[in-house]
Amino acid sequence: MERVFSVEEISDPFWVPPPPPQSAAAAQQQGGGGVASGGGGGVAGGGGGGNAMNRCPSEWYFQKFLEEAVLDSPVPNPSPRAEAGGIRGAGGVVPVDVKQPQLSAAAAAAATTSAVVDPVEYNAMLKQKLEKDLAAVAMWRASGTVPPERPGAGSSLLNADVSHIGAPNSIGGNATPVQNMLSGPSGGSGSQLVQNVDVLVKQPTSSSSREQSDDDDMEGEAETTGTARPADQRLQRRKQSNRESARRSRSRKAAHLNELEAQVSQLRVENSSLLRRLADVNQKYNDAAVDNRVLKADVETLRAKVKMAEDSVKRVTGMNALFPAASDMSSLSMPFNSSPSEATSDAAVPIQDDPNNYFATNNDIGGNNNYMPDIPSSAQEDEDFVNGALAAGKIGRTASLQRVASLEHLQKRMCGGPASSGSTS
Protein backbone atom coordinates (compact mmCIF):
# COMPACT_ATOMS: atom_id res chain seq x y z
CA MET A 1 0.00 0.00 0.00
CA GLU A 2 1.32 3.44 -0.90
CA ARG A 3 2.31 5.64 1.94
CA VAL A 4 2.24 9.42 1.75
CA PHE A 5 4.95 11.22 3.67
CA SER A 6 4.54 14.66 5.07
CA VAL A 7 7.01 17.41 4.44
CA GLU A 8 8.01 17.32 8.10
CA GLU A 9 9.54 13.87 7.67
CA ILE A 10 11.99 15.08 5.02
CA SER A 11 15.48 15.52 6.42
CA ASP A 12 17.36 18.81 6.08
CA PRO A 13 20.20 17.55 3.75
CA PHE A 14 17.66 17.11 0.93
CA TRP A 15 17.08 20.85 0.74
CA VAL A 16 19.59 23.25 -0.79
CA PRO A 17 21.28 25.33 1.91
CA PRO A 18 20.09 28.94 1.77
CA PRO A 19 22.50 31.67 0.72
CA PRO A 20 24.00 33.99 3.35
CA PRO A 21 21.60 36.69 4.56
CA GLN A 22 21.85 40.18 3.19
CA SER A 23 21.19 43.49 4.75
CA ALA A 24 17.64 44.78 5.15
CA ALA A 25 18.21 47.77 2.83
CA ALA A 26 19.54 45.63 0.04
CA ALA A 27 16.64 43.23 0.53
CA GLN A 28 14.11 46.08 0.29
CA GLN A 29 15.79 47.47 -2.80
CA GLN A 30 15.83 44.07 -4.48
CA GLY A 31 12.32 43.04 -3.34
CA GLY A 32 10.45 44.31 -6.36
CA GLY A 33 13.14 43.13 -8.73
CA GLY A 34 13.09 39.63 -7.20
CA VAL A 35 9.38 39.30 -7.67
CA ALA A 36 9.53 40.59 -11.19
CA SER A 37 12.47 38.40 -12.06
CA GLY A 38 10.81 35.37 -10.53
CA GLY A 39 7.54 36.01 -12.30
CA GLY A 40 9.18 36.95 -15.54
CA GLY A 41 11.40 33.93 -15.46
CA GLY A 42 8.39 31.76 -14.88
CA VAL A 43 6.52 33.33 -17.73
CA ALA A 44 9.51 33.14 -20.00
CA GLY A 45 10.11 29.57 -19.05
CA GLY A 46 6.48 28.70 -19.60
CA GLY A 47 6.25 30.53 -22.89
CA GLY A 48 9.60 29.32 -24.16
CA GLY A 49 8.37 25.78 -24.55
CA GLY A 50 5.60 25.68 -27.05
CA ASN A 51 4.65 22.10 -26.24
CA ALA A 52 4.23 22.53 -22.47
CA MET A 53 1.93 20.00 -20.80
CA ASN A 54 -1.48 20.95 -19.44
CA ARG A 55 -1.66 21.47 -15.72
CA CYS A 56 -4.21 19.77 -13.47
CA PRO A 57 -6.11 21.95 -10.98
CA SER A 58 -4.13 20.64 -8.02
CA GLU A 59 -0.82 21.77 -9.56
CA TRP A 60 -2.21 25.22 -10.34
CA TYR A 61 -3.46 25.54 -6.79
CA PHE A 62 -0.11 24.49 -5.42
CA GLN A 63 1.71 26.89 -7.75
CA LYS A 64 -0.51 29.76 -6.68
CA PHE A 65 0.05 28.85 -3.05
CA LEU A 66 3.80 28.99 -3.51
CA GLU A 67 3.57 32.34 -5.30
CA GLU A 68 1.46 33.82 -2.55
CA ALA A 69 3.79 32.43 0.10
CA VAL A 70 6.80 33.96 -1.65
CA LEU A 71 5.05 37.30 -1.99
CA ASP A 72 4.02 37.14 1.69
CA SER A 73 7.61 36.64 2.84
CA PRO A 74 9.06 39.85 4.47
CA VAL A 75 12.53 39.68 2.97
CA PRO A 76 12.54 38.30 -0.56
CA ASN A 77 15.91 37.50 -2.03
CA PRO A 78 16.10 36.58 -5.70
CA SER A 79 18.55 33.92 -6.64
CA PRO A 80 20.53 33.75 -9.88
CA ARG A 81 19.48 30.07 -10.10
CA ALA A 82 15.78 30.87 -9.97
CA GLU A 83 15.19 29.74 -13.53
CA ALA A 84 17.14 26.47 -13.41
CA GLY A 85 16.77 23.83 -10.73
CA GLY A 86 14.10 21.78 -9.03
CA ILE A 87 12.84 20.37 -5.81
CA ARG A 88 15.35 18.01 -4.31
CA GLY A 89 13.55 15.02 -2.85
CA ALA A 90 14.31 11.41 -1.96
CA GLY A 91 14.42 10.40 -5.61
CA GLY A 92 16.56 13.37 -6.76
CA VAL A 93 15.85 16.81 -8.10
CA VAL A 94 12.36 17.02 -9.63
CA PRO A 95 11.99 19.90 -12.09
CA VAL A 96 8.59 21.56 -11.95
CA ASP A 97 7.41 23.82 -14.68
CA VAL A 98 5.98 26.88 -12.96
CA LYS A 99 3.87 28.46 -15.68
CA GLN A 100 2.87 31.91 -14.70
CA PRO A 101 1.09 34.66 -16.64
CA GLN A 102 2.91 37.79 -17.54
CA LEU A 103 2.86 40.16 -14.58
CA SER A 104 1.93 43.64 -15.50
CA ALA A 105 2.28 46.73 -13.47
CA ALA A 106 -1.23 46.29 -12.08
CA ALA A 107 -0.40 42.77 -10.95
CA ALA A 108 2.73 44.04 -9.24
CA ALA A 109 0.68 46.70 -7.52
CA ALA A 110 -1.89 44.11 -6.44
CA ALA A 111 0.90 41.93 -5.11
CA THR A 112 2.32 44.82 -3.10
CA THR A 113 -1.14 45.64 -1.73
CA SER A 114 -1.85 42.00 -0.84
CA ALA A 115 1.06 42.07 1.56
CA VAL A 116 -0.79 44.64 3.64
CA VAL A 117 -3.85 42.32 4.16
CA ASP A 118 -4.61 41.04 7.67
CA PRO A 119 -2.39 38.00 8.39
CA VAL A 120 -5.15 36.04 10.19
CA GLU A 121 -7.58 36.33 7.30
CA TYR A 122 -4.84 35.56 4.86
CA ASN A 123 -3.83 32.44 6.79
CA ALA A 124 -7.46 31.29 6.85
CA MET A 125 -7.70 31.82 3.12
CA LEU A 126 -4.49 29.90 2.58
CA LYS A 127 -5.73 27.07 4.76
CA GLN A 128 -8.97 26.87 2.80
CA LYS A 129 -7.07 26.81 -0.47
CA LEU A 130 -4.75 24.13 0.86
CA GLU A 131 -7.68 21.97 1.86
CA LYS A 132 -9.15 22.40 -1.60
CA ASP A 133 -5.82 21.49 -3.15
CA LEU A 134 -5.51 18.39 -0.98
CA ALA A 135 -9.06 17.34 -1.81
CA ALA A 136 -8.33 17.79 -5.51
CA VAL A 137 -5.14 15.77 -5.17
CA ALA A 138 -7.01 12.98 -3.34
CA MET A 139 -9.68 12.90 -6.03
CA TRP A 140 -7.05 12.87 -8.75
CA ARG A 141 -5.29 9.94 -7.08
CA ALA A 142 -8.53 8.06 -6.57
CA SER A 143 -9.48 8.51 -10.23
CA GLY A 144 -6.08 7.40 -11.56
CA THR A 145 -4.38 3.99 -11.45
CA VAL A 146 -1.97 3.78 -8.55
CA PRO A 147 0.63 0.98 -8.51
CA PRO A 148 0.65 -1.16 -5.35
CA GLU A 149 4.19 -0.27 -4.27
CA ARG A 150 6.82 2.11 -5.52
CA PRO A 151 10.30 1.48 -4.18
CA GLY A 152 11.51 4.94 -5.15
CA ALA A 153 8.47 6.91 -4.00
CA GLY A 154 9.00 10.50 -3.01
CA SER A 155 8.86 11.58 0.57
CA SER A 156 6.85 14.74 0.05
CA LEU A 157 3.37 15.43 -1.30
CA LEU A 158 4.79 17.35 -4.25
CA ASN A 159 7.14 14.54 -5.19
CA ALA A 160 4.25 12.04 -5.09
CA ASP A 161 2.07 14.29 -7.26
CA VAL A 162 4.79 14.82 -9.82
CA SER A 163 5.63 11.10 -9.96
CA HIS A 164 1.99 10.34 -10.96
CA ILE A 165 2.32 12.55 -14.02
CA GLY A 166 4.34 9.84 -15.80
CA ALA A 167 7.31 9.79 -18.13
CA PRO A 168 5.40 10.29 -21.46
CA ASN A 169 4.05 13.69 -20.30
CA SER A 170 7.49 15.08 -19.67
CA ILE A 171 7.90 18.71 -18.79
CA GLY A 172 9.22 20.71 -21.69
CA GLY A 173 10.60 24.19 -22.03
CA ASN A 174 12.57 26.26 -19.62
CA ALA A 175 10.75 25.37 -16.44
CA THR A 176 11.16 27.52 -13.38
CA PRO A 177 12.19 25.31 -10.46
CA VAL A 178 10.27 25.85 -7.28
CA GLN A 179 13.24 24.97 -5.11
CA ASN A 180 15.16 28.01 -6.30
CA MET A 181 12.14 30.15 -5.55
CA LEU A 182 12.08 28.73 -2.04
CA SER A 183 15.81 29.06 -1.60
CA GLY A 184 15.93 32.46 -3.29
CA PRO A 185 15.00 34.49 -0.20
CA SER A 186 17.09 34.64 2.87
CA GLY A 187 17.73 31.55 4.95
CA GLY A 188 15.23 32.49 7.61
CA SER A 189 12.41 33.14 5.15
CA GLY A 190 13.00 29.84 3.28
CA SER A 191 12.99 27.74 6.43
CA GLN A 192 9.93 29.55 7.77
CA LEU A 193 8.12 28.89 4.47
CA VAL A 194 8.91 25.18 4.64
CA GLN A 195 7.79 25.04 8.28
CA ASN A 196 4.52 26.82 7.46
CA VAL A 197 3.86 24.43 4.62
CA ASP A 198 4.58 21.52 6.95
CA VAL A 199 2.16 22.81 9.57
CA LEU A 200 -0.59 23.41 7.03
CA VAL A 201 -0.13 20.11 5.18
CA LYS A 202 0.39 17.74 8.11
CA GLN A 203 -3.21 17.09 9.21
CA PRO A 204 -4.89 17.06 5.79
CA THR A 205 -2.17 14.83 4.42
CA SER A 206 -2.80 12.14 7.01
CA SER A 207 -6.53 12.20 6.35
CA SER A 208 -6.00 12.14 2.60
CA SER A 209 -3.60 9.22 2.96
CA ARG A 210 -6.22 7.28 4.90
CA GLU A 211 -8.84 8.09 2.26
CA GLN A 212 -6.43 7.07 -0.46
CA SER A 213 -5.63 3.76 1.25
CA ASP A 214 -9.35 3.03 1.67
CA ASP A 215 -9.99 3.87 -1.98
CA ASP A 216 -7.10 1.69 -3.05
CA ASP A 217 -8.45 -1.16 -0.93
CA MET A 218 -11.90 -0.78 -2.43
CA GLU A 219 -10.49 -0.66 -5.96
CA GLY A 220 -8.28 -3.66 -5.23
CA GLU A 221 -11.24 -5.62 -3.89
CA ALA A 222 -13.35 -4.63 -6.89
CA GLU A 223 -10.60 -5.64 -9.28
CA THR A 224 -10.04 -8.87 -7.35
CA THR A 225 -13.72 -9.78 -7.38
CA GLY A 226 -14.05 -8.75 -11.02
CA THR A 227 -11.06 -10.81 -12.09
CA ALA A 228 -11.74 -13.66 -9.68
CA ARG A 229 -15.24 -14.37 -10.92
CA PRO A 230 -14.12 -16.17 -14.10
CA ALA A 231 -11.41 -17.93 -12.12
CA ASP A 232 -13.96 -18.97 -9.50
CA GLN A 233 -16.27 -20.17 -12.22
CA ARG A 234 -13.49 -22.19 -13.81
CA LEU A 235 -12.56 -23.54 -10.40
CA GLN A 236 -16.17 -24.51 -9.70
CA ARG A 237 -16.47 -26.18 -13.10
CA ARG A 238 -13.22 -28.03 -12.51
CA LYS A 239 -14.39 -29.15 -9.08
CA GLN A 240 -17.71 -30.28 -10.51
CA SER A 241 -16.00 -32.21 -13.29
CA ASN A 242 -13.62 -33.77 -10.77
CA ARG A 243 -16.55 -34.82 -8.60
CA GLU A 244 -18.37 -36.33 -11.58
CA SER A 245 -15.27 -38.19 -12.74
CA ALA A 246 -14.67 -39.45 -9.21
CA ARG A 247 -18.30 -40.59 -9.00
CA ARG A 248 -18.01 -42.40 -12.32
CA SER A 249 -14.78 -44.05 -11.28
CA ARG A 250 -16.34 -45.16 -7.99
CA SER A 251 -19.34 -46.62 -9.83
CA ARG A 252 -17.04 -48.47 -12.23
CA LYS A 253 -14.99 -49.80 -9.36
CA ALA A 254 -18.14 -50.89 -7.51
CA ALA A 255 -19.45 -52.71 -10.61
CA HIS A 256 -16.08 -54.39 -11.15
CA LEU A 257 -15.96 -55.37 -7.48
CA ASN A 258 -19.46 -56.87 -7.66
CA GLU A 259 -18.46 -58.84 -10.75
CA LEU A 260 -15.36 -60.14 -9.02
CA GLU A 261 -17.40 -61.11 -5.95
CA ALA A 262 -19.85 -63.02 -8.17
CA GLN A 263 -16.96 -64.83 -9.83
CA VAL A 264 -15.47 -65.66 -6.45
CA SER A 265 -18.77 -67.09 -5.18
CA GLN A 266 -19.14 -69.17 -8.36
CA LEU A 267 -15.59 -70.47 -8.03
CA ARG A 268 -16.25 -71.32 -4.39
CA VAL A 269 -19.32 -73.38 -5.37
CA GLU A 270 -17.31 -75.18 -8.04
CA ASN A 271 -14.51 -75.76 -5.57
CA SER A 272 -16.91 -77.25 -3.01
CA SER A 273 -18.43 -79.56 -5.66
CA LEU A 274 -14.95 -80.63 -6.76
CA LEU A 275 -14.01 -81.29 -3.14
CA ARG A 276 -17.11 -83.47 -2.70
CA ARG A 277 -16.30 -85.39 -5.86
CA LEU A 278 -12.73 -85.82 -4.68
CA ALA A 279 -13.96 -87.17 -1.35
CA ASP A 280 -16.25 -89.63 -3.17
CA VAL A 281 -13.42 -90.76 -5.41
CA ASN A 282 -11.16 -91.24 -2.40
CA GLN A 283 -13.85 -93.31 -0.68
CA LYS A 284 -14.31 -95.44 -3.78
CA TYR A 285 -10.56 -95.90 -4.02
CA ASN A 286 -10.39 -97.05 -0.42
CA ASP A 287 -13.27 -99.48 -1.00
CA ALA A 288 -11.61 -100.78 -4.15
CA ALA A 289 -8.35 -101.26 -2.27
CA VAL A 290 -10.16 -103.29 0.41
CA ASP A 291 -11.95 -105.37 -2.23
CA ASN A 292 -8.66 -105.94 -3.98
CA ARG A 293 -7.08 -107.29 -0.82
CA VAL A 294 -10.10 -109.57 -0.23
CA LEU A 295 -9.94 -110.84 -3.80
CA LYS A 296 -6.23 -111.49 -3.49
CA ALA A 297 -6.90 -113.56 -0.38
CA ASP A 298 -9.65 -115.47 -2.21
CA VAL A 299 -7.32 -116.10 -5.14
CA GLU A 300 -4.69 -117.50 -2.78
CA THR A 301 -7.31 -119.75 -1.21
CA LEU A 302 -8.46 -120.97 -4.60
CA ARG A 303 -4.89 -121.63 -5.61
CA ALA A 304 -4.41 -123.76 -2.53
CA LYS A 305 -7.62 -125.68 -3.25
CA VAL A 306 -6.56 -126.21 -6.86
CA LYS A 307 -3.24 -127.54 -5.72
CA MET A 308 -4.94 -129.96 -3.32
CA ALA A 309 -7.28 -131.08 -6.07
CA GLU A 310 -4.35 -131.68 -8.38
CA ASP A 311 -2.68 -133.79 -5.73
CA SER A 312 -5.82 -135.87 -5.23
CA VAL A 313 -6.23 -136.30 -8.97
CA LYS A 314 -2.66 -137.48 -9.21
CA ARG A 315 -3.28 -140.08 -6.53
CA VAL A 316 -6.48 -141.29 -8.24
CA THR A 317 -4.79 -141.48 -11.61
CA GLY A 318 -1.99 -143.50 -10.03
CA MET A 319 -4.54 -146.04 -8.66
CA ASN A 320 -6.23 -146.33 -12.06
CA ALA A 321 -2.91 -147.23 -13.59
CA LEU A 322 -2.98 -150.53 -11.62
CA PHE A 323 -6.25 -151.71 -13.18
CA PRO A 324 -4.74 -152.77 -16.52
CA ALA A 325 -2.28 -155.03 -14.67
CA ALA A 326 -5.13 -156.80 -12.90
CA SER A 327 -6.95 -157.34 -16.18
CA ASP A 328 -3.81 -158.86 -17.63
CA MET A 329 -3.60 -161.26 -14.74
CA SER A 330 -7.23 -162.34 -15.23
CA SER A 331 -6.58 -163.02 -18.86
CA LEU A 332 -3.64 -165.27 -17.97
CA SER A 333 -5.76 -167.49 -15.57
CA MET A 334 -8.47 -168.43 -18.01
CA PRO A 335 -8.76 -172.26 -17.32
CA PHE A 336 -11.45 -172.28 -14.68
CA ASN A 337 -14.31 -174.66 -14.26
CA SER A 338 -17.09 -173.42 -16.37
CA SER A 339 -20.38 -174.53 -15.02
CA PRO A 340 -23.75 -173.46 -16.33
CA SER A 341 -24.50 -171.87 -13.06
CA GLU A 342 -21.32 -169.83 -13.17
CA ALA A 343 -21.98 -168.94 -16.75
CA THR A 344 -25.46 -167.84 -15.98
CA SER A 345 -24.22 -166.04 -12.97
CA ASP A 346 -21.55 -164.37 -15.04
CA ALA A 347 -24.07 -163.48 -17.67
CA ALA A 348 -26.50 -162.22 -15.13
CA VAL A 349 -24.00 -159.91 -13.50
CA PRO A 350 -25.31 -156.43 -14.04
CA ILE A 351 -23.01 -153.58 -14.94
CA GLN A 352 -23.76 -150.72 -12.61
CA ASP A 353 -22.58 -147.19 -13.05
CA ASP A 354 -22.55 -146.59 -9.34
CA PRO A 355 -18.97 -146.20 -8.25
CA ASN A 356 -19.90 -146.94 -4.63
CA ASN A 357 -20.70 -150.50 -5.57
CA TYR A 358 -17.34 -150.69 -7.28
CA PHE A 359 -15.53 -149.47 -4.21
CA ALA A 360 -17.48 -151.85 -1.98
CA THR A 361 -16.56 -154.85 -4.06
CA ASN A 362 -13.08 -153.58 -4.28
CA ASN A 363 -12.81 -153.59 -0.54
CA ASP A 364 -14.09 -157.12 -0.40
CA ILE A 365 -11.56 -158.10 -2.97
CA GLY A 366 -8.85 -156.46 -1.03
CA GLY A 367 -9.85 -158.34 2.11
CA ASN A 368 -10.03 -161.83 0.51
CA ASN A 369 -7.53 -161.66 -2.34
CA ASN A 370 -4.04 -162.41 -1.30
CA TYR A 371 -2.66 -161.74 -4.74
CA MET A 372 -3.75 -158.06 -4.97
CA PRO A 373 -1.97 -155.29 -3.06
CA ASP A 374 -3.83 -153.37 -0.45
CA ILE A 375 -5.14 -150.07 -1.81
CA PRO A 376 -5.61 -147.55 0.93
CA SER A 377 -8.81 -145.61 0.64
CA SER A 378 -10.41 -142.92 2.68
CA ALA A 379 -13.58 -140.90 2.53
CA GLN A 380 -11.69 -137.75 1.52
CA GLU A 381 -9.99 -139.49 -1.34
CA ASP A 382 -13.24 -141.06 -2.45
CA GLU A 383 -14.88 -137.69 -2.32
CA ASP A 384 -12.10 -136.15 -4.32
CA PHE A 385 -12.30 -138.91 -6.84
CA VAL A 386 -16.06 -138.54 -7.20
CA ASN A 387 -15.75 -134.81 -7.58
CA GLY A 388 -13.06 -135.24 -10.18
CA ALA A 389 -15.11 -137.80 -12.05
CA LEU A 390 -18.21 -135.66 -12.04
CA ALA A 391 -16.21 -132.61 -13.08
CA ALA A 392 -14.70 -134.54 -15.96
CA GLY A 393 -18.21 -135.16 -17.25
CA LYS A 394 -17.88 -138.94 -17.09
CA ILE A 395 -15.51 -138.96 -20.06
CA GLY A 396 -14.30 -142.44 -20.77
CA ARG A 397 -16.70 -143.87 -18.22
CA THR A 398 -17.65 -146.81 -20.40
CA ALA A 399 -14.13 -148.18 -20.76
CA SER A 400 -13.36 -147.90 -17.11
CA LEU A 401 -16.62 -149.55 -16.09
CA GLN A 402 -15.98 -152.41 -18.44
CA ARG A 403 -12.61 -152.98 -16.87
CA VAL A 404 -14.18 -152.73 -13.44
CA ALA A 405 -16.83 -155.27 -14.41
CA SER A 406 -14.22 -157.66 -15.73
CA LEU A 407 -12.21 -157.18 -12.57
CA GLU A 408 -15.25 -157.93 -10.39
CA HIS A 409 -16.00 -161.04 -12.42
CA LEU A 410 -12.44 -162.15 -11.95
CA GLN A 411 -12.56 -161.56 -8.25
CA LYS A 412 -15.82 -163.45 -7.86
CA ARG A 413 -14.44 -166.38 -9.75
CA MET A 414 -11.30 -166.33 -7.68
CA CYS A 415 -13.26 -166.05 -4.46
CA GLY A 416 -15.92 -168.53 -5.49
CA GLY A 417 -13.51 -171.16 -6.77
CA PRO A 418 -12.23 -172.45 -3.43
CA ALA A 419 -15.67 -172.32 -1.86
CA SER A 420 -17.29 -174.33 -4.65
CA SER A 421 -14.50 -176.85 -4.59
CA GLY A 422 -14.87 -177.33 -0.86
CA SER A 423 -18.60 -177.84 -1.12
CA THR A 424 -18.25 -180.36 -3.92
CA SER A 425 -15.66 -182.31 -2.07
UniProtKB/Swiss-Prot annotation:
Domain of life: Eukaryota
Record keywords, A-Z: DNA-binding, Nucleus, Transcription, Transcription regulation
UniProt-listed Gene3D superfamilies: 1.20.5.170
Ranges annotated as biased composition (Acidic residues): 213-222
Domain called bZIP: residue spans: 232-295
GO cellular component: nucleus
Keyword DNA-binding: yes
Chief localisation class: nucleus
Gly residues bias spans: 30-50
SUPFAM superfamilies: Leucine zipper domain
Keyword match Chaperone: no
Compartments where located: Nucleus
InterPro entries: Basic_leucine-zipper_C, bZIP, bZIP_plant_GBF1, bZIP_sf
Region (Leucine-zipper): 260-274
Spans annotated as Basic motif: 234-253
Compositionally skewed regions (Polar residues) per UniProt: 171-182
Basic and acidic residues bias: start-end ranges: 231-247
Quaternary context: Heterodimer with RISBZ1/BZIP58.
Stated role: Transcriptional activator that binds to the DNA specific sequence 5'-GCCACGT[AC]AG-3' found in the alpha-globulin gene promoter. Does not bind to promoters of other major storage genes such as glutelin, prolamin and albumin. Binds to the DNA specific sequence 5'-TGAGTCA-3' found in seed storage protein gene promoters.
Protein name: bZIP transcription factor RISBZ2
Gene: RISBZ2
